[in-house]
Amino acid sequence: YANLAESYSAIPSRLLAITHGISAVGKSSVAMRLVEALGALRFRSDFERKRLLGEQDSEQQNTLGGGIYNPNASAATYQRLHALAADALQAGFPVVIDATYLKSEQRQAAWQIAESTGTPFLILDCQAPDEVVATWLKQRQAEGLDPSDATAEVILAQRKNLEPLSPEEIA
C-alpha cells in the first residue's frame, strides 16, 4: 500500500494533456488510458464540434474541409475545447483534450492555457503505420459507434497538412 500511495503522490493534481496525430491513429485510446490513470476530464473534438455546430449533412460530407470542418468551424471547435479545458483546470481537474492538433498554432493555444493556469503541459504524439491506420479506420466505420466523420480521403489530407512537433514541443 505504501508503494501505491507513493505512486499517487507523483501524479500532478492538475495537468493539461493534448493528443497529436491524424484520425484513426489511436488518439482516443491513448487519451482514455490517461483519463483512467489520472481521473482526468476528457474533451473530444468530435463531440464538441457536433455540440457546437450540429451534425454534418450528407451533402457536406462529400466536401473535404467543408461544412462543420471548414477552417472557421475548426477554429471555433478548438476555442470551445480550450475554454472547457481552462475552466476545468481552474477548478483543479486534470484535463485531456482528444483532438488532432495538426497545426502548431492549435498546440500553442493549448500550451498558453496550461501556462496561464500554472499547469504542466503534455503532448501525446500518436503515430501508427499506414496499414494499421487503414485497418483501424475500417473497423471503426464497420462498428458505426465512433463520432468521427473521418474517411480515408480525410486521413490523406491530414497527413499532407500535419505540422510536425517542433523541438520545443518534443522536449
Language model: regions and residue ranges:
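Conserved lysine of the Walker
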Residues: K27
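Hydrophobic anchor at the beta1->P-loop junction of P-loop NTPases
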Residues: A17-T19, S45
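Conserved phosphate-donor/acceptor-positioning beta-strand/loop module used by diverse small-molecule
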Residues: S116-L137
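Small-molecule kinase domains that catalyze NTP-dependent phosphoryl transfer to phosphate-bearing small molecules
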Residues: Q139-A171
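Conserved substrate/cofactor phosphate-moiety recognition/catalytic segment
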Residues: V35-F93
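Extreme N-terminal, non-catalytic leader segments
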Residues: Y1-L16
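Hydrophobic positions on the alpha1 helix immediately C-terminal to the Walker A/P-loop
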Residues: V30, L34
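P-loop (Walker A) phosphate-binding loop of NTP-binding proteins
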Residues: I22
